[in-house]
Amino acid sequence: MNHYTILGLSEPPHVPELTSADLKTAYKQALLKNHPDKLQEREAYTGSVQITAITTAYACLSNSKLKKEYDLSLKNGANGVKSGPGSDVFDLTELEEREDADGMFSWYKPCRCGEAGGYVLTEEHLENNEKYYEGVDVQFHEIVVQCGTCSLWITVQYGVEEE
């Protein structure tokens, strides 16, 4: 699946040109269609598109520079897989871990834009992300994180310890 199919759109070229309003509408419809709270049966979620994939697709296609690079990769037969800046996937263990005075953990990764602490992930982010995986049996979870100073995104995968 590529970013266009994830959002329920046809692949380029688009005639007429795909507008930002079209993209935003497709994004909202994809979120509603695939959100666990909106599905009729919890089992249906396992076959749906992950919310993080929808968010990543929208982030790429709504940025004109990233969209051009992505469209070029599709044209060149790359099927959009890991194309363009900001589409890297990392394991949580690859990020620098820090603990604050209250015992809360945060993870950091430098961004290609040059910002040393560009990507920041907190325990709260991970806890909030868990609601998307309730009742779903997967080996790892993932969350999309945007750089704090630019438009690049990464996907962070992590395992969850059973309590």
Curated annotation (Swiss-Prot):
Zn(2+) binds at C111, C113, C147, C150. Residues 2-74 form the J domain. Residues 89-159 form the DPH-type MB domain. Its main location: cytoplasm. GO terms for molecular function: metal ion binding. Pfam families: DnaJ, Zn_ribbon_CSL. This is Diphthamide biosynthesis protein 4. It comes from Yarrowia lipolytica (strain CLIB 122 / E 150). The lineage of its organism: Eukaryota, Fungi, Dikarya, Ascomycota, Saccharomycotina. The gene is DPH4.
